[in-house]
Amino acid sequence: MVQVAVMGAGSWGTTVAKVFADAGNEVRLWARRAEVAEDVRDNHRNSAYLGDIELPAALTGTTDPAEALNGAEIVVLGVPSQSLRENLQNWKDLIGPDASLVSLAKGIEHSSGLRMSQLVSEVADVPSERVAVLTGPNLAREVAQGQPAATVVACTDMDRAKLIQAAVAAPYFRPYTNTDVIGCEIAGTCKNVIALAAGIAAGMGFGDNTAATVITRGLAETTRLALEVGADARTLSGLAGMGDLVATCTSTLSRNRRFGEHLGKGETLEQAAASTKGQVAEGVVSSQSVFELAEKVGVETPITEAVVGVCHEGADVQQIMMGLLGRSKKAE
């Protein structure tokens, strides 16, 4: 049994906390809002994010970071990518000297260009081999319901990856290890952007052929970028690559896809956010960071560029989609 702290009580953070508890560990879930922590602690629910799904008794909630992190051997970071730095600065002195840090966030920090594992290592002042990422085709509600799923625990230290793998292996949740942190993080970031594009296409009324094209060409540009920055090509065809991409681009549970659908129907960013519980999808923020990284290393990412045009430059979705199809012809 391992002592686990999960910092962030959104839908995915709460779900991961549930998985660790179902795997036989004691878990403390830190929530920013008192009513969420109380719901988890007193009712074994997170009604705000997971409805009536019952949470295990081994999982408790708190709003006190010190209480959550006290004695934690595994610290799971479940806050959004663009607020991770600020939160981690507040928590870093409370994290044990030998604790493993696991990032759930998928993104590239816009101000620095850092991947999330790099940001965690820098801000918490820990060596990179103590930082892992958990990523894969893991839609929170399905996992929280106990539906079978697999994931990837990526860490440059394979022994540490195996320790985390053992701790998070629940009867319905199968973790695989990988040492390609770069590939897993680039894939996890880009898939949100591609899912926006898939949603835009669906919102415009296009069908399965278009969806398959967006997904496949999205994987192609993700792979080009990932390889250019040092990833292993095999990662892109695995759970953290193709698996996560397919789930996020096709599922009605995917916030990025749903957000894209609203954009495809002609809504503004503000209207789309209002239609999706007031949240701007992660892919909107990530699209700029991904495009800037791609330009920096000289990689062509036309789908990402199109998403940037729609989300940040006021481009018309019809013109953008037709522009993608009208690009100069080339070999696949």
Swiss-Prot record:
The gene is gpsA. Belongs to the NAD-dependent glycerol-3-phosphate dehydrogenase family. The keyword Plastid does not apply. The active site is at K191. Pathway: Membrane lipid metabolism; glycerophospholipid metabolism. It comes from Corynebacterium jeikeium (strain K411). Keywords: Cytoplasm, Lipid biosynthesis, Lipid metabolism, NAD, NADP, Nucleotide-binding, Oxidoreductase, Phospholipid biosynthesis, Phospholipid metabolism. One of its GO terms (biological process) is phospholipid biosynthetic process. It catalyses: sn-glycerol 3-phosphate + NAD(+) = dihydroxyacetone phosphate + NADH + H(+); sn-glycerol 3-phosphate + NADP(+) = dihydroxyacetone phosphate + NADPH + H(+). NADPH binds at S11, W12, R32, R33, K106, A140, R255, V280, E282. This is Glycerol-3-phosphate dehydrogenase [NAD(P)+].
